[in-house]
Amino acid sequence: MIALGIDPGSRRCGYGVVAREGTRLVVVASGVLAPRAERPVAERLARILDGLAEVIRRAGPAECSIEQVFSGASVRSALVLGQARGVALAAAAQAGLPVFEYAPSEVKLAFTGSGRATKDQMIRTAHMLLGATPGLSDEADALALAVCHLARRAGRLAVPAVRNVAVSVPGVAGRARPLALPPARERAALAAARLRPSRRDHRGLA
């Protein structure tokens, strides 16, 4: 199974595509879509939509995961995030991908073993667990979303080895190295695996 994680934003949108092959996790593609900041919001969102559509077309994920909206954001931040989330949901819907939502703490728990992981810890875990080297937390968060969803789907997460596959997105390289998942993190993944999706969208392309 191949899962797409999206960390939406109007200035930067992280994406991570991870495949589960038996007991292996494979980073198919990951990166950050970052339109020029001086462009109008509508144009930035349109470019992100096009970029996500291209990622989906090339990487071929079966399902999509995204973070739930948290209530601590300011009104302005919530409005901007809502616009970016709408673009991410639209990209998934256009490709016929079901969308699953997870709370930020649930994603962090499944990925790092701690529901309060910092941005730096998320980036380090992406390198340790997947061999990826995300330059920004947006990319690490997107990879974490994909891994969290795969954990929930599998019911457990054991990773004796990871490797790359041929599918890629221009300008993005996924790297991996063998790594066994510690028991504590596997228990965290099992907890995340019991989560249920709060949103699904089954619309496909016309």
UniProtKB/Swiss-Prot annotation:
Belongs to the RuvC family. Binds 2 Mg(2+) ion per subunit. The RuvA-RuvB-RuvC complex processes Holliday junction (HJ) DNA during genetic recombination and DNA repair. Endonuclease that resolves HJ intermediates. Cleaves cruciform DNA by making single-stranded nicks across the HJ at symmetrical positions within the homologous arms, yielding a 5'-phosphate and a 3'-hydroxyl group; requires a central core of homology in the junction. The consensus cleavage sequence is 5'-(A/T)TT(C/G)-3'. Cleavage occurs on the 3'-side of the TT dinucleotide at the point of strand exchange. InterPro entries: RNaseH-like_sf (IPR012337), RNaseH_sf (IPR036397), X-over_junc_endoDNase_RuvC (IPR002176). Pfam families: RuvC. GO terms for cellular component: cytoplasm; Holliday junction resolvase complex. Mg(2+) 2 binds at E67. Its cofactor is Mg(2+). It catalyses: Endonucleolytic cleavage at a junction such as a reciprocal single-stranded crossover between two homologous DNA duplexes (Holliday junction). GO terms for biological process: DNA recombination; DNA repair. The active site is at D7, E67, D138. Homodimer which binds Holliday junction (HJ) DNA. The HJ becomes 2-fold symmetrical on binding to RuvC with unstacked arms; it has a different conformation from HJ DNA in complex with RuvA. In the full resolvosome a probable DNA-RuvA(4)-RuvB(12)-RuvC(2) complex forms which resolves the HJ. It is found in: Cytoplasm. Its EC number is 3.1.21.10. GO terms for molecular function: crossover junction DNA endonuclease activity; DNA binding; magnesium ion binding. Mg(2+) 1 binds at D7, D138. Keywords: Cytoplasm, DNA damage, DNA recombination, DNA repair, DNA-binding, Endonuclease, Hydrolase, Magnesium, Metal-binding, Nuclease. This is Crossover junction endodeoxyribonuclease RuvC.
